[in-house]
């Protein structure tokens, strides 16, 4: 079933709506929809569509759409990820250091980058640490304040999810 354009549309819709972490899962999902695909075909499709694979933690990953295709609620996803997985934020000059739960830094940095905020020059992520380079010290201060607010919201969310 379907040509390349239809398959690409299906992949975008699947990735937008579902948590797909491996090429094998994507192959299986496309086959359920009637597409005759191989892992090699899906691998090429992923590259052509510019999909990124981000860490969700605890060994889990998810394919996400490129920046131009991020849903309008991308900031809501950043808030959710930030609230659940960020542990601390510190600032020095125009630099912020964001400490996360192990394995979550790259996913959060990816979302920050994809929002293309003018006040953020760029990010650099390790396993549990993100370096955020702000354009100015004032921008860094504003980001630190914003992130502190997200931390407060996140602690409330973590408490609600843990039932305590």
From Swiss-Prot:
<dbReference type="GO" id="GO:0051259">
    <property type="term" value="P:protein complex oligomerization"/>
</dbReference>
<dbReference type="InterPro" id="IPR001669">
    <property type="entry name" value="Arg_repress"/>
</dbReference>
<dbReference type="GO" id="GO:0034618">
    <property type="term" value="F:arginine binding"/>
</dbReference>
<dbReference type="InterPro" id="IPR036251">
    <property type="entry name" value="Arg_repress_C_sf"/>
</dbReference>
<dbReference type="InterPro" id="IPR036388">
    <property type="entry name" value="WH-like_DNA-bd_sf"/>
</dbReference>
<dbReference type="GO" id="GO:1900079">
    <property type="term" value="P:regulation of arginine biosynthetic process"/>
</dbReference>
<keyword id="KW-0028">Amino-acid biosynthesis</keyword>
<dbReference type="InterPro" id="IPR036390">
    <property type="entry name" value="WH_DNA-bd_sf"/>
</dbReference>
<dbReference type="Pfam" id="PF02863">
    <property type="entry name" value="Arg_repressor_C"/>
</dbReference>
<protein>
    <recommendedName>
        <fullName>Arginine repressor</fullName>
    </recommendedName>
</protein>
<dbReference type="InterPro" id="IPR020899">
    <property type="entry name" value="Arg_repress_C"/>
</dbReference>
<dbReference type="GO" id="GO:0005737">
    <property type="term" value="C:cytoplasm"/>
</dbReference>
<keyword id="KW-0805">Transcription regulation</keyword>
<keyword id="KW-0055">Arginine biosynthesis</keyword>
<comment type="pathway">
    <text>Amino-acid biosynthesis; L-arginine biosynthesis [regulation].</text>
</comment>
<dbReference type="InterPro" id="IPR020900">
    <property type="entry name" value="Arg_repress_DNA-bd"/>
</dbReference>
<dbReference type="GO" id="GO:0003700">
    <property type="term" value="F:DNA-binding transcription factor activity"/>
</dbReference>
<dbReference type="GO" id="GO:0003677">
    <property type="term" value="F:DNA binding"/>
</dbReference>
<comment type="similarity">
    <text>Belongs to the ArgR family.</text>
</comment>
<keyword id="KW-0963">Cytoplasm</keyword>
<dbReference type="Pfam" id="PF01316">
    <property type="entry name" value="Arg_repressor"/>
</dbReference>
<comment type="function">
    <text>Regulates arginine biosynthesis genes.</text>
</comment>
<keyword id="KW-0238">DNA-binding</keyword>
<keyword id="KW-0678">Repressor</keyword>
<dbReference type="GO" id="GO:0006526">
    <property type="term" value="P:L-arginine biosynthetic process"/>
</dbReference>
<keyword id="KW-0804">Transcription</keyword>
């Amino acid at each position: 079933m379907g040509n390349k354009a239809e398959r690409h549309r299906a992949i975008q819709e699947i990735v937008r709506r579902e948590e797909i972490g491996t090429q094998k899962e994507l192959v299986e999902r496309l086959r359920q929809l009637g597409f005759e695909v191989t892992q090699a075909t899906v691998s090429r499709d992923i590259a052509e569509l510019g999909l990124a694979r981000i860490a969700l933690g605890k060994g889990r990953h998810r394919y996400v759409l490129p920046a131009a295709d991020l849903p309008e609620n991308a900031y809501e996803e950043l808030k959710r990820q930030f609230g659940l997985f960020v542990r601390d934020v510190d600032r020095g000059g125009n630099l912020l250091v964001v400490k996360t739960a192990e394995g979550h830094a790259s996913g959060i940095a990816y979302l920050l980058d994809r929002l293309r905020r003018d006040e953020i020059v760029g990010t650099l992520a390790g396993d549990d640490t993100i370096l955020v380079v702000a354009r100015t010290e004032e921008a860094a201060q504003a980001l630190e304040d914003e992130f502190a607010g997200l931390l407060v919201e996140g602690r409330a969310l973590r408490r609600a999810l843990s039932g305590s």
